[in-house]
């Protein structure tokens, strides 16, 4: 079988992939500035409404652990659009939820299947020249991080202008459009010749052998946890104590957008 095409020269495809990374990752963060609106809409306590954020992050972590490895043994060209389609279904379920448990189910589906971004990025590394890997990964990571930061701002904006559910509808539609666009554009790469269980064994061996990788993974995990704790709880403080609208709460995340944009240059 011929080698996969080098996508580093296909700027249109790279932009599609970066947009998909941003949309998938950002889908987990729409609820953060909307906790107060969710609380009022479903007439529940603040703590119950805040569980939406918890379910989003826990399901995302489970998706990273158990669904992303499937991408190593599956046909990524078909698997990525499938994940994005399932994620869109979760977004639509959240948008048309009539009670809080229904929103939670939609949130869990989004969290589990939004990990398409973490399958897209390894695919990119397999389809570029080694000297271009850092640049391409940096570009896709910029898309992912900008998507996370913009997601809360846009969620707050649409909540103020229309309704808090609007962002879920729009995101679901865009997700389906991007899934369809990528389905016919993603290059095929060879699957790994190991079964699903062997992947977990290899990951454990890798962490045991590569201490530096383990340390960097822990550092990244703790750093991201700190940021998540800040943005998850600040919404409660700003809405209840300071009575700020969803728009202002969502705008807080824009502080980090410059750091996100710099990742593509760091990759070079």
Give residue ranges: language-model regions.
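Helix-breaking motifs and short loop linkers at transmembrane-helix boundaries and internal kinks
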Residues: 43, 75, 96-101, 243
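Conserved MFS/SLC helix-loop-helix module at the cytosolic interface between two early adjacent transmembrane helices
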Residues: 62-98
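Juxtamembrane intracellular "pre-TM" segments in multi-pass secondary transporters
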Residues: 2-7, 186-217
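Cytoplasmic helix-loop-helix junction between adjacent transmembrane helices
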Residues: 107-142
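Pair of pore-lining "gating" transmembrane helices in MFS-fold secondary transporters
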Residues: 10-30, 210-226
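C-terminal membrane-cytosol helix-exit motif in multi-pass small-molecule transporters
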Residues: 172-191
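Paired small-residue
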Residues: 90, 101-109
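Extracytoplasmic
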Residues: 16-46, 64-67, 117, 230-235
